[in-house]
Amino acid sequence: MVRPGLRSRSLRRVYRRTPGGSTVVHYERRKPGPARCARCGRPLGGVPRGRPPRVRRLSKTAKRPERPYGGVLCSTCLAEMIFEAIAGSS
């Protein structure tokens, strides 16, 4: 029987083939969902999906796009906000 802590479905099962030819089950934490745009809710491109310790090891530029509101707004919403700001100021 598997350990009680590993019976939870919050852990995903990964099947690994060992060098001896048998298949064993490894239990891993699931990946979090994708980062989403704060305005429209679409998944953000260029933002990695990963557990915090894995993402922490990435370089700063690998964590989010290098533009204003990168990692917060999608490019479409950012373009709309810039356009609204320019149109509203004149």
Swiss-Prot record:
GO terms for molecular function: structural constituent of ribosome. Residues 51-62 have a biased composition (Basic residues). GO terms for cellular component: ribonucleoprotein complex; ribosome. Keywords: Ribonucleoprotein, Ribosomal protein. Residues 38-65 are annotated as: Disordered. InterPro entries: Ribosomal_eL34 (IPR008195), Ribosomal_eL34_C_sf (IPR038562), Ribosomal_eL34_CS (IPR018065), Ribosomal_L34e_arc-type (IPR047868). The keyword Transcription regulation does not apply. This is Large ribosomal subunit protein eL34.
